[in-house]
């Protein structure tokens, strides 16, 4: 991001001041003013749920489309082997800068969390838990989430989909890479890992390339009678009807994961396997759920160790309606089973098909959901169920929120409320992906969700978040307050816009709720901030006051934007630009907005740059790869002057030289081409300055330090790199940085540090 990204605006009338959102804040006793920095910033509104599921239903899909445009379009998902290969190549080919000897360090948040996909616990010591993060690797806690440590830092892939622990040998843990949550930001993996020492070290046991196992592993099941008998389930392409050899489905190993065989009784082509459960007391009995968008979807059972399978249909809806389905079997009475199923036939494939109960080992089923789940949605994304270890009628399940029955489904009650304040005992983060109730502590409930780990010690009545120390936040962008050395933050996936006003990694708080968006600080006043979330909604913060200053665009225009880019005029922080498929500008700090451009190329605006050297020059790029400019501060606009030199994919970031407004740099998303380009004439002509030196991965961030205009910093899926413009040589700044995608770069002048926001491992700092 340009260094002027730290420029920001103010607010006018006071609206509402919300109480603290529960994270630790070092303030002067309730005024919102931080003692160390002197900055006052009170939280704005959390994203509230409207009646019915419609508000939240589209979020993960809208996010997916936005994410895909910046990472993989026109293909469905990132070629993960290309990422690994390119990262390895540049580590060897590009040297580190000789003048930088310090190491990257994580600067938070460590108290916010991020998307977790799975959780397991030690069978004899339920306080010892391991979780997998969608973009942050595997983490271990010895004390039920009070403290955390990661031993996954140096692995080539941080995208985790499933964990399983061998009950007979608890030091043996399996990890399936590649998230299987059916959104386009569910990044693929490279195969199945194994640890023989309780998660301290890991080895790649079975690679997807060698064995053909799925690139998105969502479940690992270990036979309780034979630890060498493993089953895994996963997804391949995002649509099961697609062809190719990157198949999902169920895979079987009888030699502890060395070799694998794909089951084809559902389909020889692509299908999904969501849940696999071994009968706890009956040898060779296995249950599993599948989706193939046809008559063979649903719940299946084998009674001979997997040689033959029977489709269980009695009392269940038409098989073709079964989408993602989670399965649970009672440990105290294995005849009782529950299934929590997504309706593949619903309009957006996100609604609940039903909660189904069997009292006879799966022979017959009954829908016990009633009308309770009418407002529950997004079941293809968050989908999990668990049965109490000692009470087969005590069941917890859910997606966005969690729901409880204590009488086998006769009645239900909602037990978590994501739209409450974070310090409310009924609050747990939204989008639940895995539930665990340890046999040794049957009333303890662990929930792995988009906010990290929530824990109940009383069977779900009250909840606390146990994510402190779990630095797995998935950022979209970040900014720093240039007037303070202690204030910075960013917009995060499903964790709002979060900031710290003390410089402490453990004192972040939620400034704005929901999915975080763009954040921009006023360069002269750290207490003045703009922040956005989806659908062009923009809020302005002035210390203790906040105000909705969303541009007056038609609803159809707002709905076309997942995350609105915001930037300030470097010469006047009261002049702010944002965009949908056209450019909006305010000259009075957000009080009034005007659409200053026509529709550009029909796609969403991806970046806006107001040149510090001449603020009349405004450059705009789009998701379709378009490039437009205004020479009069936004009054008039050029046609699309994107050059054939540019690849035609999303231009993710624009940056101009602090000394020359005509010198423009651009980064481009996706794979298969160069990614960094320079124009010396304001975008009329372009040249490739990547020249194959940089990794062929999506690029997201650009930065020129005002103190060092001869260097250009870029952030991409493989790390951080710097160009010496005089020599044309690139250098690698990635040493000691986790293998997570770097989505934003900002230089913090007062702290003399480069900050990198990652999608999965929080924010990191490199001191100069």
Task: Kindly label every feature range from the protein language model.
Residues 4-19:
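Intrinsically disordered, polybasic Lys/Arg-rich low-complexity tracts
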Residues 24:
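Cationic, low-complexity basic patches in intrinsically disordered or flexible, solvent-exposed regions
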């Amino acid at each position: 991001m340009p260094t002027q990204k730290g420029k920001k605006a103010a607010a006018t009338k006071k609206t509402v001041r919300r109480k603290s959102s529960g994270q630790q804040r070092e303030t002067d006793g309730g005024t919102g003013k931080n003692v160390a920095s002197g900055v006052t910033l009170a939280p704005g509104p959390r994203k509230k749920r409207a009646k019915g599921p419609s508000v939240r239903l589209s979020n993960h899909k809208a996010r997916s489309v936005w994410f895909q445009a910046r990472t993989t379009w026109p293909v469905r998902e990132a070629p993960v082997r290309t990422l690994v290969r390119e990262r390895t190549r540049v580590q060897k080919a590009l040297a580190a800068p000789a003048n930088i000897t310090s190491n990257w360090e994580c600067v938070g948040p460590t108290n916010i969390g991020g998307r977790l996909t799975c959780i397991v616990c030690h069978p004899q010591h339920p306080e010892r838990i391991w979780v997998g993060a969608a973009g942050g690797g595997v983490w271990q806690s010895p004390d039920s989430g009070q403290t955390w440590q990661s031993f996954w830092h140096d692995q080539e892939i941080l995208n985790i989909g499933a964990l399983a622990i061998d009950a007979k040998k608890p030091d043996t843990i399996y990890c399936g890479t590649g998230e299987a949550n059916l959104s386009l930001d569910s990044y693929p993996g490279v195969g199945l890992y194994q640890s023989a020492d309780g998660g301290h070290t890991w080895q790649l046991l079975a690679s997807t390339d060698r064995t053909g196992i799925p690139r998105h592993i969502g479940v690992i099941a270990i036979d309780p009678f034979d630890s060498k008998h493993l089953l895994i389930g996963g997804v391949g392409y995002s649509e099961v009807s697609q062809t190719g050899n990157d198949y999902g489905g169920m895979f079987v190993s009888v030699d502890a994961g060395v070799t694998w065989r794909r089951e084809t009784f559902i389909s020889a082509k692509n299908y999904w396997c969501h849940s696999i459960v071994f009968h706890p007391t009956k040898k060779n009995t296995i249950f599993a759920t599948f989706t193939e968008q046809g008559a063979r979807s649903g719940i299946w059972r084998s009674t001979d160790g997997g040689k033959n399978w029977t489709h269980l249909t009695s009392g269940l809806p038409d098989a073709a309606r079964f989408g993602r389905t989670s399965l649970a079997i009672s440990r105290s009475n294995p005849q009782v089973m529950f299934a929590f199923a997504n309706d593949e036939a619903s309009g957006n494939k996100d609604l609940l098909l039903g909660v189904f109960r069997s009292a006879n080992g799966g022979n017959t089923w009954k829908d016990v959901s009633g009308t309770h789940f009418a407002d529950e949605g997004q079941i293809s994304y968050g989908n999990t169920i668990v049965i109490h270890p000692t009470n087969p009628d005590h069941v917890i399940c859910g997606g966005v929120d969690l729901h409880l029955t204590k009488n086998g489904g006769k009645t239900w009650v909602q037990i978590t409320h994501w739209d409450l304040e974070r310090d409310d005992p009924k609050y747990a983060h939204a989008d639940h992906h895995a539930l665990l109730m340890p046999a040794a502590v049957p009333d303890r409930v662990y929930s792995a969700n988009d906010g990290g780990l929530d824990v109940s010690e009383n069977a779900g009545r009250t909840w606390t978040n146990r994510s402190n120390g779990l630095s797995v936040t998935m950022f979209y962008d970040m900014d720093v307050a240039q007037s303070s050395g202690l204030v910075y933050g960013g917009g995060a996936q499903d964790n709002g816009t979060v900031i710290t006003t003390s410089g402490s990694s453990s004192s972040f708080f939620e400034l704005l709720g929901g999915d975080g968006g763009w954040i921009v600080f006023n360069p002269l006043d750290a207490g003045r901030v703009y922040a956005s979330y989806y659908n062009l909604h923009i809020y302005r913060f002035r210390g203790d006051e906040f105000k909705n200053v969303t541009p007056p665009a038609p609803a159809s225009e707002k709905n076309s934007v997942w995350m609105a880019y915001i930037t300030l005029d470097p010469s006047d922080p009261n002049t702010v630009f944002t965009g949908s498929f056209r450019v909006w500008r305010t000259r009075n700090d957000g009080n009034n907005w005007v659409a200053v451009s026509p529709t550009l190329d029909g796609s969403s605006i991806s970046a806006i740059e107001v040149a510090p050297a001449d603020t009349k020059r405004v450059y705009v790029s789009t998701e379709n790869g378009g490039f437009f400019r205004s020479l009069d501060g936004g009054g008039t606009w050029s046609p699309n002057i994107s050059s054939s030199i540019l690849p035609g994919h999303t231009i993710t970031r624009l940056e101009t030289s602090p000394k020359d407004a005509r010198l423009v740099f651009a980064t481009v998303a996706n794979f298969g081409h160069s990614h960094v380009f320079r124009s010396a004439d304001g975008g009329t002509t372009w040249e490739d300055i990547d020249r194959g030196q940089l990794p062929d991965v999506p690029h997201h961030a650009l930065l020129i330090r005002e103190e060092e205009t001869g260097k250009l910093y870029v952030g991409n899926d493989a790390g951080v790199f710097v160009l010496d413009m005089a020599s044309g040589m690139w250098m690698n700044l990635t040493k000691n940085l986790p293998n997570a995608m770097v989505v934003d770069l900002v230089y913090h002048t007062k702290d003399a540090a480069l900050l990198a926001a990652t999608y999965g491992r929080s924010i990191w700092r490199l001191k100069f």
